């Protein structure tokens, strides 16, 4: 029992100890959170207002209040106070607001649409009046003009819109356009062969194909025992030719010693395809007059490539006294579709011909590549392998020199190394900056720490190693790392160097002299110290004088998160916003147009009526923003910061 009681007592004491430790940890965590909240409370007061709110200065107390914005289609009729919320009212007729706002009156709608324009969007509480040209017209030089009408033989290539005219093109081969139009494209010619018809008249760019029935001889269901029917595409008529069993007058049927051969002949002056009138056929030698009945004249007008000759086949008369039988028979022909094979239409065979041509080209390319590769394998490389290795090593050795020249800024005949400038300022923070830039490990950082005596030497070697290690190293990344570690003072020094307003110590920014200007700069090693650092006086070439330092990265350098410093050129003229920062914002806005109205709405409570009138008279939004920078920049630093906060909140791409 004593042992059991002692164990229970020990467990209770352990549980009390664990509870005390847990309570102590919870209390410590709460204290740490409270400390962090007190640290971050002061910067949070300077951050921009939350979305959906605006700042208002109470005229009675002078206190800056944060009020909720009014929704789109309304305006603030009464601002909020310490005791009441803001009051919103609907926009009156003829005014509008597109976004939630904190303005005291709505924007006026645009003027009514001039004739002949029509309204796409009417003037409403949420939208401004928008005018467009009516259908069939497009806007040109502020007026509406009718769409161009494509003439005959031309078709619409691109349909016209409200802002662009119609584009016409001449009808290609196989297409036509027979009416002037501003909406119709070229139509394809009628496929006569596909409809089992003949092309009577080929089409042009202005007319369609003229199709007709095919000419053939029908032998089914004849009207009589000796009748042949002719079909023509234009003259659908039937001509009956009497049978040869008809016994004309004056012909002796008992004459068994003579034979008659009746055949139509085509004279040299008559075009093929016509059947001349043969009224009689005489046999002068025998003295017997044999006449045939006069058949009706048949005239056929066909295309030049369809010509037919009607031939009357001869018949033999039997000597036994029977009636002679002379029948008119059509020549034996194949199926009418056989005529289609006489004409080669390239449009029908063009697709598979193109496919065959591409396959042939592909085969030729493969064969040539195989032959070339086989020759290369047989001959071997043209150069000695050792020479190739030497060239590769030379290219690698030249890379650090090019990277190093990238970071040199020429000023007053001296080459100033930006990396050395940063290394001289960051001090012991170079470790954090180097790890941020390269994602380096502690082992790599320790290598630089053991190889040099001073912090600026370690920082310079680490930054050089960063530029050589990553070819994508840029000034924007370096500035981002400096801001990440709250070294805006170094960024301002770089700005001052570019603006030529800061007196720098040239002995600290001198470049190390290399033994030979042509020898490649080796990769900085942690075990080698930088010695013999002297001032490098370099006269830049005309190309170096004309080119801008870090042309593609000037915008990130000049884009700051606070108002201007006293060293900037524009601040000396009395403005709290630097010219570089303003130009950066305006350049970005002009390159990528966006809606700037929310920025103007945020600044209305700072502008007086005269300044507001001046800004409203400017037509272009970018010019309005430029003027707004000039007006707000000379008011106060707080107003300038409010404008910058509004710009960065509504244009997040600038960050």
From Swiss-Prot:
TNFR-Cys repeat ranges per the UniProt record? 50-88, 90-131, 133-167, 170-211
- Cystine bridges: 67-80, 70-88, 91-106, 109-123, 113-131, 133-144, 150-168, 171-186, 192-211
Pull the Extracellular topological domain ranges from the record. 42-349
Topology relative to the lipid bilayer, per the entry, is: Single-pass type I membrane protein
Q: Tissue range of expression? A: Detected in spleen B-cells (at protein level). Ubiquitous. Highly expressed in adult spleen, thymus, testis, prostate, ovary, small intestine, colon, brain, lung and kidney, and in fetal brain, liver and lung. Detected at lower levels in adult peripheral blood leukocytes, lung, and in fetal muscle, heart, kidney, small intestine and skin. Detected in T-cells, B-cells and monocytes. In T-cells expression is highest in Th0 cells, intermediate in Th2 cells and lower in Th1 cells.
Where do the TM regions start and end? Answer: 350-370
User: For the Death domain, which residue ranges apply?
Assistant: 415-498
Chain positions covered by the region annotation Disordered: 222-305, 318-339
**Record's comment on post-translational modification:** Oxidized in response to reactive oxygen species (ROS), leading to endocytosis.
GO CC terms for this protein? plasma membrane
Q: Which UniProt keywords apply?
A: Adaptive immunity, Apoptosis, Cell membrane, Disulfide bond, Glycoprotein, Immunity, Lipoprotein, Membrane, Oxidation, Palmitate, Receptor, Repeat, Signal, Transmembrane, Transmembrane helix
* Glycosylation sites recorded in the entry for this protein: 82, 141, 252, 257, 278, 289
Q: Which residues lie on this side of the membrane: Cytoplasmic?
A: 371-655
* Assembly notes: Associates with TRADD. Interacts with NGFR. Interacts with CASP8.
* Role noted for this protein: Promotes apoptosis, possibly via a pathway that involves the activation of NF-kappa-B. Can also promote apoptosis mediated by BAX and by the release of cytochrome c from the mitochondria into the cytoplasm. Trophic-factor deprivation triggers the cleavage of surface APP by beta-secretase to release sAPP-beta which is further cleaved to release an N-terminal fragment of APP (N-APP). Negatively regulates oligodendrocyte survival, maturation and myelination.
Protein name (Swiss-Prot/TrEMBL): Tumor necrosis factor receptor superfamily member 21
Task: Supply the source organism's classification.
Answer: Eukaryota, Metazoa, Chordata, Craniata, Vertebrata
């Amino acid at each position: 029992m004593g042992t059991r009681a002692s164990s229970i007592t020990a467990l209770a004491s352990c549980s009390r100890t664990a509870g005390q430790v847990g309570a102590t940890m919870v209390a410590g965590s709460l204290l740490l959170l409270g400390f962090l909240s007190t640290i971050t409370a002061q910067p949070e007061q300077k951050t921009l207002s939350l979305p959906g709110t605006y700042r208002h200065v109470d005229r009675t107390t002078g206190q800056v209040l944060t009020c909720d914005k009014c929704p789109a289609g309304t305006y603030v009729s009464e601002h909020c106070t310490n005791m009441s919320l803001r009051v919103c009212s609907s926009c009156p007729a003829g005014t509008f607001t597109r976004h939630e706002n904190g303005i005291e009156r709505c924007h006026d709608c645009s003027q009514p649409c001039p004739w002949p324009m029509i309204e796409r969007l009417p003037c409403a509480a949420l939208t401004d009046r928008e005018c467009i040209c009516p259908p069939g017209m497009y806007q040109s030089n502020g007026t509406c003009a009718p769409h161009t009408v494509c003439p005959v033989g031309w078709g619409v290539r691109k349909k016209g819109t409200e802002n662009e005219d119609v584009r016409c093109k001449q009808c290609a081969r196989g297409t036509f356009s027979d009416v002037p139009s501003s909406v119709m494209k070229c139509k394809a010619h009628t496929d006569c062969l596909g409809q089992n018809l003949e092309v009577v008249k080929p089409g042009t760019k202005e007319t369609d194909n003229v199709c007709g029935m095919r000419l053939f001889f029908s032998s089914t269901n004849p009207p009589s025992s000796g009748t042949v029917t002719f079909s023509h595409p234009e003259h659908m008529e039937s001509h009956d030719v009497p049978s040869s069993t008809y016994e004309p007058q004056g012909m002796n049927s008992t004459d068994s010693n003579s034979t008659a051969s009746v055949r139509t002949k085509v004279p040299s002056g008559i075009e093929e395809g016509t059947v001349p009138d043969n009224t009689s056929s005489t046999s002068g030698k025998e003295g017997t007059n044999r006449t045939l009945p006069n058949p009706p004249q048949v005239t056929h007008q066909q295309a030049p490539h369809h010509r037919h000759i009607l031939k009357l086949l001869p018949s033999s008369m039997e000597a036994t006294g029977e009636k002679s039988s002379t029948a008119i028979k059509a020549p034996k022909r194949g199926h009418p579709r056989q005529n289609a094979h006489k004409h080669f239409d390239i449009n029908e065979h063009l697709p598979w011909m193109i496919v065959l041509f591409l396959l042939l080209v592909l085969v030729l390319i493969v064969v040539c590549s195989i032959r070339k590769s086989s020759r290369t394998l047989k001959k071997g490389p043209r150069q000695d392998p050792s020479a190739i290795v030497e060239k590769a090593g030379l290219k690698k050795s030249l890379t650090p020199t090019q990277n190093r020249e990238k970071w040199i800024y020429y000023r007053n005949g001296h080459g100033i190394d930006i990396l050395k400038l940063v290394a001289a300022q960051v001090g012991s923070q170079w470790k954090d900056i180097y790890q941020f830039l390269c994602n380096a490990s502690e082992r790599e950082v320790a290598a630089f720490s053991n190889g040099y005596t001073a912090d600026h030497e370690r920082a310079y070697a680490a930054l050089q190693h960063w530029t050589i290690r990553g070819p994508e190293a840029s000034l924007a990344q370096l500035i981002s790392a400096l801001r990440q570690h709250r070294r805006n003072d170094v960024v301002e020094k770089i700005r001052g160097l570019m603006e030529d307003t800061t007196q720098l110590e040239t002995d600290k920014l001198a470049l190390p002299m290399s033994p030979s200007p042509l020898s490649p700069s080796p990769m900085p090693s942690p075990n080698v110290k930088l010695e013999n650092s002297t001032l490098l006086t370099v006269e830049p070439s005309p190309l170096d004088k004309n080119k801008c330092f870090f042309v593609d990265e000037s915008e990130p350098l000049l884009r700051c998160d606070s108002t201007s410093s006293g060293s900037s050129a524009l601040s000396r003229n009395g403005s709290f916003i630097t010219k570089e920062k303003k130009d950066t914002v305006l350049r970005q806005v002009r390159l990528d147009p966006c809606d700037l109205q929310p920025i103007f709405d945020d600044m209305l409570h700072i502008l007086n009526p005269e300044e507001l009138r001046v800004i409203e008279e400017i037509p272009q939004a970018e010019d309005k923003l430029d003027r707004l920078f000039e007006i707000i920049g000379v008011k106060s630093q707080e107003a300038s910061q409010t404008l910058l906060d509004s710009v960065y909140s509504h244009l997040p791409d600038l960050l």
